[in-house]
Amino acid sequence: MSEDVSKNLSETLFVKHKQAKETSALTQYMPTSQKILDEREEHEDRAWYRHLRRIQWAWQGLSPIEMEGVLSKIASSNHSRTEDKWLDTVMGYHGGNWTFEWIKLGMEHQRRANEMKGEEAADELFTASLCFSIAGYPHLKNDNLAIQAQVLANKAYSEGSEKTKYVIKQIEVPYQKRKIIANLHLPRTDKQLPVVMVSAGLDSLQTDMWRLFRNHLAPKDLSLIHI
């Protein structure tokens, strides 16, 4: 994906959502549960609404330096927040907003991919996909910004799959009269290989498992299917 096309897609997806509700404002709790949460917050000293998965994101391939760079931009924002006590609750799609800053980093990796070929380009695109996935984290179903970020994540992953030497394709898995879309990753196609099936939590995407496949499964001739 060219830099201009990537930028245009981002602008198209987010143009109607610049005043979208900030993620922390979307979850509604039962009165009894809200009381418990309020009491817990009184005893917790946390500065972020989201749980920052620094170790996991680094393991998945994100540079710790880039990660801290994004978090510092979010933390230092002067824009209004849904909750002043939580740094990552900047309202509106602009600088300092969680989704905005991670999308910006993802687009930088897409730009780098345009200057590379083969596996290097694929790695940049898969990293871009991870950034877009984090932009939508924790992937609440009614979060419009997160939904748009997922579109970018899937697009970047698809672009990366076309450049890598490995085979990545979507398949349909029948389940209870329905069909589930899954991503199948194959290190080679000249013979049948064992398959590792992964089903992550609701706060992750199918596109988050690239490094697990490339670094740990593919060298051992293991395929990966992520449902």
Language-model region placement:
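Alpha-helical protein-protein interaction scaffolds
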Residues: 52-160
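An acidic- and aromatic-residue-enriched active-site/binding cleft used to recognize and process polar
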Residues: 187, 201-202
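Conserved small/polar residues in nucleotide/adenosyl-binding loops
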Residues: 225-227
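N-terminal cap/lid segment of alpha/beta-hydrolase-fold proteins
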Residues: 102, 148-188
